[in-house]
Amino acid sequence: FTNSEVCSIEKFAQKIKDLDPGDIIEFGVASAQTTIEIARNNLDRKLFAYDHFMGLEESSKPLPIHAGWHEGAFRVGDPDYPHIPGSIAGVFKKLEPYPNVNLFVEDVHELKDPSEYGIGKVVAVNVDVDIYEPTVSCLKFLDKCDWDKLYIRFDDWHGHDPQFDHHERLAAREWLDRTGYKFEIPENGHVGGMIVWR
């Protein structure tokens, strides 16, 4: 894919409006800024958001030098990222004006069946877990969800930067190879957008 289009959070939130009725899932909340952007533009849709708020785990894959993806990065109270609230309670407080958001403090590797969260048919997904291992778990969770067509935003796609070859793109490629889902990548820039059909 040669295009360098970027799937900004604003563009993603707007494009969801044109999708069929259904729910939205977000993996990786951190500061809740993307959660808020999606929620406020799609008040008629339920948004199910997941994060354990402990920051990044250690990855077995090579990390891009300049990404800042060390273990614990982006956790609540991370002094390197003052826009992230100091506590999980602070994240819940930021999301209070958005009753369509269902926030779950859970590790993506340990998610239960989608029915236990009340997730209905899914139409859109925001993946912002950065590294390979949690991205694999997020995509495996989607296999258990009810959906026909998904619009998936990958926050750290970096379609033309080989330093990121071992993370979201690798997990997505392996998922597509394993499942045989049909797909298109209309946005292949640093933030990717993919349409997937079952």
Language model features with spans:
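Conserved SAM-binding loop and adjacent beta-strand
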Residues: F1-I9
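S-adenosylmethionine/decaboxylated-SAM
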Residues: E10, Q14-R198
